[in-house]
Amino acid sequence: MKSSIDILPDGSITTPKGFKAGAIYAGIKKKSKNNLDLAILYSDTPCIAAGIFTTNKFRAAPVYISEHNLGFTDNRAIVVNSGCANAGTGEAGMADAIEMVKATAESLNMQPKDVLIASTGVIGHRLPIDKIKENVRLIGLSQRNGHEFARAIMTTDTRSKEIAVQVNIEGFQFYIAGAAKGAGMIHPNMATMLGFITTDASVSKEFLQFALKEAADVSFNMITVDGDTSTNDSLFMLSNGQAENPTFAGNTEYSLVFQQALTIVCQNLAKSIARDGEGAKRLIEIQVEGAANLEDARLIARVIAGSPLVKTAVHGADPNWGRILAAAGRAGADFDIDMVDLYLGESPVLLKGARTGVDEKELSSWLRQVEVIIKLNLNLGQGKAAAWGCDLSAEYVKINADYTT
């Protein structure tokens, strides 16, 4: 079977057929050069929807509502605000989220159950619900507004994060696209910060949820900036079927290509989040192979990527690779140190548990790259995984010390 997956140079969340978006400044966050803080993603036709949400016990109101509405069919829209998380706001916050969904549904002439919702921003503050209800009705929807949607969901992000791919499989074509936000409080578990995926492919609901979970497990669930999991983490996917392909379901050749394309989209967005970590200068990729199993490989990769000592060493271009081994050793997975190989880029610093004597000045120079790849081979089994993080700088401390002041 012939197939191709191509990343489009100017793709956005509205690249798939039938999707529109719009954004406006509603006064939720302080005025800035990016004067957008309220957005809608919309499909011309009803969608099959899937979602994955935060495992943080301190969940925000919009998470509960979206999880509930995903239980219905025909979801068609997602309303998103930035600047206020609507978490830690009690019954009043839940009422505000419900009002936000109702106002959006009325403006789009649909039922509230058809609308999903997401919020991001400062915890513990009420939404300015009157401003939101007034402005959500003014949002103009267009296929051209995908980039505006990606900008409107940003908080401390320094750049928008979006991608679209075109997939061709033996005579038919479809698109998968995505937008995400996140730069701090990034340590997801079964979710991401905020992520939105669209496709015009026809997909069964069961397979869509399965495929999204599979893609998240090798992308959003493998990134870390600071070890904190948000109260609002949500990942949504909408499929409107306008590509009119044979419906993807189960383990078929077609569905495997769909899964591959979805994984490309999710990994691209996840790496963009890690690369844009608050105050970060470098993207760190941890590659673990030779683990006893997949779970051990993922565990070790995530612990190394999240280690403050590893992150600060990379920031300072300090080739103190003992920190990498120490992080791997505390991950809780079994391995034999006398079998371990460790590479910084292509340079072996440890082979079969013994130091190789690579010149540290050369390593320090290499660590100044914008993308740093660390490879650990346990030489024990077939387990293999990758995780992504970023360096930890003084700027991260400054951003978060002054976040609300």
UniProtKB/Swiss-Prot annotation:
Heterotetramer of two alpha and two beta chains. Catalyzes two activities which are involved in the cyclic version of arginine biosynthesis: the synthesis of N-acetylglutamate from glutamate and acetyl-CoA as the acetyl donor, and of ornithine by transacetylation between N(2)-acetylornithine and glutamate. This is Arginine biosynthesis bifunctional protein ArgJ. Belongs to the ArgJ family. Pathway: Amino-acid biosynthesis; L-arginine biosynthesis; L-ornithine and N-acetyl-L-glutamate from L-glutamate and N(2)-acetyl-L-ornithine (cyclic): step 1/1; Amino-acid biosynthesis; L-arginine biosynthesis; N(2)-acetyl-L-ornithine from L-glutamate: step 1/4. The keyword Acyltransferase applies. It comes from Dehalococcoides mccartyi (strain CBDB1). Substrate binds at residues 155, 181, 192, 278, 400, 405. GO terms for biological process: L-arginine biosynthetic process; ornithine biosynthetic process. The keyword Kinase does not apply. The active site is at 192 (nucleophile). The record marks 120-121 as: Involved in the stabilization of negative charge on the oxyanion by the formation of the oxyanion hole. Its EC number is 2.3.1.35, 2.3.1.1. GO terms for cellular component: cytoplasm. SUPFAM superfamilies: DmpA/ArgJ-like (SSF56266). It comes from the Bacteria. InterPro entries: Arg_biosynth_ArgJ (IPR002813), ArgJ-like_dom_sf (IPR016117), ArgJ_beta_C (IPR042195). HAMAP family: ArgJ. Its main location: cytoplasm.
